[in-house]
């Protein structure tokens, strides 16, 4: 996995009251709690989920 480009994603806003599809995107990225940070591989699929819920996230290049 070291040769793959990673992106650090942090959940900074709550998913309470959000659309079910947006909650699913957050879960798909591996985020469960606020202020939790995960490193995800930079793929078009993950970028699509990040773009869909970008208003809930903080994204940094790893």
UniProtKB/Swiss-Prot annotation:
GO BP terms: translation
Name of the protein: Large ribosomal subunit protein uL30
Entry's Gene Ontology molecular function annotations: structural constituent of ribosome
Gene designation: rpmD
InterPro entries reported for this sequence: Ribo_uL30_ferredoxin-like_sf, Ribosomal_uL30_bac-type, Ribosomal_uL30_ferredoxin-like
Entry annotated with the keyword Disulfide bond: no
Keyword Ribosomal protein in annotation: yes
Database matches in SUPFAM superfamilies: Ribosomal protein L30p/L7e
Subunit structure comment from the entry: Part of the 50S ribosomal subunit.
Family affiliation: Belongs to the universal ribosomal protein uL30 family.
Keyword list, A-Z: Ribonucleoprotein, Ribosomal protein
The organism's place on the tree of life at top rank: Bacteria
Gene Ontology cellular component annotations, sorted alphabetically: cytosolic large ribosomal subunit
């Amino acid at each position: 996995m070291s040769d793959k480009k990673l992106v650090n994603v942090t959940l900074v806003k709550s998913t309470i009251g959000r659309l079910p599809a947006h909650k699913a995107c957050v879960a798909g990225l591996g985020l469960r709690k606020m202020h939790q940070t995960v490193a995800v591989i930079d793929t078009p699929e993950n970028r699509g989920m990040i773009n869909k819920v970008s208003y809930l996230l903080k994204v940094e290049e790893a």
